[in-house]
Amino acid sequence: MSVEEKLNQAKGSIKEGVGKAIGDEKMEKEGAAEKVVSKVKEVAEDAKDAVEGAVEGVKNMLSGDDK
């Protein structure tokens, strides 16, 4: 989980909320898009970490280092 992506999600939420509050539809949509992009990046990072962990586990099993 990336702290940077969590911060970007929060920034997007704030931007979306401000846009909604002041009636700026463009700002609202930009904020919503930033939130989604950051969430996708976070999920991709988590998946990458999981795959790397699984690969490392398989390597250890094959080399006998899993003990």
UniProtKB/Swiss-Prot annotation:
Domain of life according to the entry: Bacteria
Annotated spans, Disordered: 1-30
InterPro entries, sorted: CsbD, UPF0337_stress_rsp, YjbJ_sf
Pfam families: CsbD
Coiled-coil spans in chain: none
Family: Belongs to the UPF0337 (CsbD) family.
PANTHER family assigned: UPF0337 PROTEIN YJBJ
Protein name: UPF0337 protein spr1626
